[in-house]
Amino acid sequence: MPTLVLEHTIYTLGQLLSVEKPQIALAGRSNVGKSSLVNALAGQKNLAKVSATPGKTRSINFYHVEPQDYYLVDLPGYGYARASHAERRSWAALLEKYLSTCRHLRALALLLDSRLTPQKLDLELSHFARECGLDILPILTKADKCTQRERAARAAEWADILGVKPSITSSSKKSGIRELWQRLHDTAGVPPVSPEDGPTQAVVPQGGIPHSITPQSGSSSATEE
């Protein structure tokens, strides 16, 4: 499998980098299993720290995919309301700036809990991404925590909403990871190293990201989202 290397961590608008390589952003509700998925993709246990407390990731983390040479960009989780109004506005501005102006952003990988019906915040973020001109790659997480019938129903719901078939994954069981890697490679526009490995003008949508779609207070380390 490819190797993931954490190269950059961004906290403020002024720190946003101009990385001249393809990027795929990873986004999802707090406690959707984003950090666990990063670790499963990396084949490691602690590349992204996992916490039982949702809403802890407060940074944008750039993971370099080697040797394919593109980035997975881990965005802060949203939907866990323990932050001041000013903090929510600050983080909304950071995410809006990144999603709407990054020329090398290929797609938004939207992580969705297999156990839940489509949620308002997920729908709002998918709408914002589409307004930015971004493709959406839906990823169902925690597939091991529901039945096959429930997974199929959820996948059908999101496919109908987004017009894209979701990838179905379980980080704990490592299922769907190789297939997801292939899909990420294809989305980034780079070839895989082996069969085993699994410039557009910026558009700023009117209204921006709803303030509810923001990370919340917690530690600055990359933790479970």
Task: Specify the residue positions occupied by each region the protein language model found.
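Helical mechanochemical/support elements of P-loop NTPase systems and associated helical scaffolds
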Residues: 20, 46, 59, 71, ...
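Conserved alpha-helical scaffold flanking the Walker A/P-loop in AAA+ ATPase domains
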Residues: 59-64, 93-101
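Conserved G1/Walker A P-loop phosphate-binding module
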Residues: 1-80, 202, 224
